[in-house]
Amino acid sequence: MRAIADGLLREPAHVGVAVCAVLRDETRAANDLFVRVAERAKSAGLRLAGALQQDEPRPGRRRCDMFLRDLASGRLIRISEDRGDLAQGCRLDPGALTEAAELIERAIRSASPDLVILNKFAKAEAEEGGGVRDAIAAALEADIPVLIGVAAAYAPALRDFAGDLCAIVADEAAVRRWLGARFGEWEWLAEGEAVAR
């Protein structure tokens, strides 16, 4: 599947690319990148919408609880169901994901953010037409750039959804180039940090 996604990679560093999708092989690395971007964007005065995933370990459990932190309000929404330590399969709480997605979409429509950051485009968006899909559409309608993670398995669906407005990238350097093209007043450093000029 990664080979299919690699065929979708393209350079994002021009203003016409509204969605920069980071190919996620390792969830923690992508989350860390998004946290750094969000922190630097806020420190430079940019208004943000979207959500970042926070995983909280549970004592005595193999799997953590999953939360989304709304970037506009700071609200923390638990998106995983507690199905017991031995449960297998998806633990995502669809109702909680819908609640988070609606909160994000409202922020996009009412607060005119400068940047939307979403932790991932996954099964809910690709196969079910739900999740944060409407929030992405709202951002595109308002010409607000979107930074999002995507697993190789869902990269073709994201590309089908966003078309030529989407660039799928595999490294942090490409994200920095995209951010530099969208927010020219920023100098994006090699370490993945941003400093306002």
Name every feature range the model reports, one short phrase each:
Residues 2-42, 46-48:
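Glycine-rich P-loop/Walker A and Walker A-like loops and their local beta1-loop-alpha1 context
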Residues 17-21, 114-115, 145-147:
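Residue-level preference for the first positions of well-ordered beta-strands
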Residues 31, 35-84:
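N-terminal phosphate/diphosphate-binding loop that engages ATP/GTP or pyrophosphate donors
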Residues 85-116, 125-127, 131-133, 137:
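Phosphate-binding/switch loop-helix module in NTP-utilizing enzymes
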Residues 120:
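Walker B catalytic acidic pair
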Residues 135-152:
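Substrate-engagement module of ASCE P-loop NTPases
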Residues 151-166:
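Glycine-rich, charge-decorated loop segments at or immediately adjacent to ligand/cofactor-binding or catalytic sites
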Residues 171-197:
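A charged, well-structured terminal subsegment
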